[in-house]
Amino acid sequence: AVFDQSCKGVYDRSLFSKLDRVCDDCYNLYRKHYVATGCRRNCYGNLVFRQCLDDLMLVDVVDEYYVASVQMV
């Protein structure tokens, strides 16, 4: 994964990898380029990312991922 320059704040490699993995897995699920780019938009603070969490059945950790994405902004 390549670091997204739009993400501000403290760069935490493990946190970034965790968020990026959600988008990679979501892309692998749908195989649509716009899913991968949309998921990462606004430093993961978007509805596509939230939908990916739901689609990947990660709803039990949504709050954890949301807090992580806010830390990246």
From Swiss-Prot:
Keywords: Amidation, Carbohydrate metabolism, Disulfide bond, Glucose metabolism, Hormone, Neuropeptide, Secreted. It comes from the Eukaryota. PROSITE patterns: CHH_MIH_GIH (PS01250). Its main location: secreted. InterPro entries: Crust_neurhormone_CS, Crust_neurohorm, Crust_neurohorm_sf, Hyperglycemic, Hyperglycemic1. It is found in: Secreted. Coiled coil: none annotated. The modification Valine amide is found at residue 73. Disulfide bonds join 7-43, 23-39, 26-52. One of its GO terms (molecular function) is neuropeptide hormone activity. Signal peptide: none annotated. GO terms for cellular component: extracellular region. Produced by the medulla terminalis X-organ in the eyestalks and transported to the sinus gland where they are stored and released. One of its GO terms (biological process) is circadian rhythm. Hormone found in the sinus gland of isopods and decapods which controls the blood sugar level. Has a secretagogue action over the amylase released from the midgut gland. May act as a stress hormone and may be involved in the control of molting and reproduction. Belongs to the arthropod CHH/MIH/GIH/VIH hormone family. This is Crustacean hyperglycemic hormone. It comes from Jasus lalandii (Cape rock lobster). The lineage of its organism: Eukaryota, Metazoa, Ecdysozoa, Arthropoda, Crustacea.
